[in-house]
Structures are given as C-alpha cells and as structure tokens.
Regions:
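Local sequence-structure signature of Cys/Sec-based thiol-disulfide redox active-site neighborhoods
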Residues: 1-27
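Thiol-based oxidoreductase modules, predominantly thioredoxin-like and allied folds used
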Residues: 28-41, 51
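Structural micro-motif
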Residues: 48-58
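Non-catalytic, surface beta->alpha helical segment in thiol-disulfide oxidoreductase systems
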Residues: 59-82
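A conserved beta-strand-loop-helix scaffold within acyl/acetyltransferase catalytic domains
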Residues: 91-95, 99-115
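A short, internal acetyl-CoA/4′-phosphopantetheine-binding micro-motif in the GNAT/acyltransferase core
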Residues: 120-127
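Conserved acetyl-CoA-binding loop-helix of GNAT-fold acetyltransferases
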Residues: 128-141
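Conserved GNAT acetyl-CoA-binding A-motif
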Residues: 141-156
Length: 175
C-alpha cells in the first residue's frame, strides 16, 4: 500500500488533474477507482461518508478532500513526502516552509520601498537544532539579489545575518 491514495474516477477531470499533479511531483500513489472497484468505493465511503465524495486523498492515513494545489503541497510536505521548497506568500507577507508539525515562516512588512523582516517562527520542538538558522539562510539567499532595501528587526534574523559579510552589507548591519 502506498502512502498516497487517490480516490476518484478516471473520467473525472479533477481526478485526472490530481493524477497529473502527483506525477509532475514524481510521487508514487495508488489510484482507487471508485466507479470500477466496489472495495475502493466502500473505503471512500468509510473515509469521507460517501463514495461520491471524490476526488479525495488519503495521505499517510489523513483524509484530504479536493484540495487546491498549495494545500496539497502543504499536506504532502507535512507528511514528509514532498518538498515544495521555499514559498513566498506576498499577500500574507511571509516566506514559508511547510513542515511537520507546523510551518516555519519569516514575516515582513513594507515601509515604503523597504522590506522589514520582523519575525521568524519555527516549531518549538526544533529549537536548538539549527533549523531556524538554516531557514533564515534560505530566506536570505532568496532575497539577497533584490534591489529594494531590506531591514531586519528580528534579533534572531540579525544574528544569522551577521554570519556573512554580504548579508551585513545588504541588510545594513553594523552601520
């Protein structure tokens, strides 16, 4: 049995969409065709309350019904099955990395043309593991070539930025 089960009907465009998304991500999955396999229909009915509630995923035992792609990526990442990489959510003004048990993020605000990174958060269970510094490094590598000014008000982000001369210069530390 696979870690990813997709319940659906191959004739359904949404089911085909999810099949393509999983294949694009290089993920192995089991296709449970509820219209052709009575056992698959019964398993979906037990999982979702009806055999008609497809497409539905079961990802490492967790039910995920008809997700948008970012939500699917998040569920796959939290299950340790896929790494969508660093995500820049401009609307929420955050850089995000999906992981279990909760996402890591760096928040920022705009002050005119200046990006001000105000906070980093990593699940407390990872404190002291170096994960926060690695995540901050990943964010800094993402933004270091941007033309706009970037300031850091978060003490932890400032501490990490002080480790490299190019970041001290970019973030105007030590001036």
């Amino acid at each position: 049995m696979h870690d990813i089960m997709l319940f659906g009907e191959v004739r359904c465009h949404k089911t085909r969409f999810y099949q393509a998304a999983l294949e694009e991500r290089g993920l192995a999955y089991e296709m449970a065709e509820v219209d052709k396999d009575k056992e698959a229909a019964a398993r979906l009915a037990e999982l979702a309350g009806s055999a008609d509630k497809f497409p539905t995923f079961q990802i490492k035992g967790r039910k995920v019904r008809n997700p948008k792609l970012p939500e699917l990526d998040k569920e796959l990442a939290r299950a340790g099955l896929y790494d969508p990489g660093l995500i820049h959510d401009e609307r929420a003004q955050r850089f995000i990395r999906h992981m279990a048990p909760s996402d890591a993020f760096v928040s920022y605000v705009w002050q005119g043309d200046r990006m001000v990174m105000t906070h980093i958060e990593v699940d407390p269970s990872f404190r002291g593991s170096g994960l926060g510094a690695r995540f901050a490094t990943e964010v800094f590598e993402e933004v270091e070539s941007r033309a706009h000014e970037i300031r850091l008000t978060c003490p932890f982000l400032r501490k990490v930025a002080l480790t490299r001369p190019e970041w001290r210069k970019k973030f105007k530390l030590g001036e």
